[in-house]
From Swiss-Prot:
This is Large ribosomal subunit protein uL23c. It comes from the Eukaryota. Keywords: Chloroplast, Plastid, Ribonucleoprotein, Ribosomal protein, RNA-binding, rRNA-binding. Part of the 50S ribosomal subunit. It comes from Euglena gracilis. One of its GO terms (biological process) is translation. InterPro entries: Nucleotide-bd_a/b_plait_sf, Ribosomal_uL23-like, Ribosomal_uL23/eL15/eS24_sf, Ribosomal_uL23_CS. Signal peptide: none annotated.
Amino acid sequence: MFYFISRKFYDQFKYGILTDKTNKLLKNNVYTFDVDIQMSKRQFKDLIETAFSVKITSVNSYVKSSKYYRSNNFEGMKKYYKRMFIKLNDLETIPFFSCL
C-alpha cells in the first residue's frame, strides 16, 4: 500500500521549495511545494495527509505563468507550474523539512 501511495506521490509531486522566503514561512508551519499543473487542492491535501500522516489546516495555490527566454539564436519559453502552500497544525511537522 505504501508503495502505491509513494509512486502516486512522485508522479504528481515535483519538489519542495527551499528559498529565503519559504524558510521564513517554515517558522509559521507553512510548507511550499511545486506540483503537477492539473492537481487540485483537494487531491494535494489528501496526498500529503496520507504520505506524511499529518493534518492540514489550509491549502493555497497559484499558477506561475511561463516566461520567454533567449539564448544565442534560440528562443523559447520556460514551463509554467503550480505552487502549493500548506499550513499544518502547530504541533505537527513534515520530517523532511524539520531537519533543515
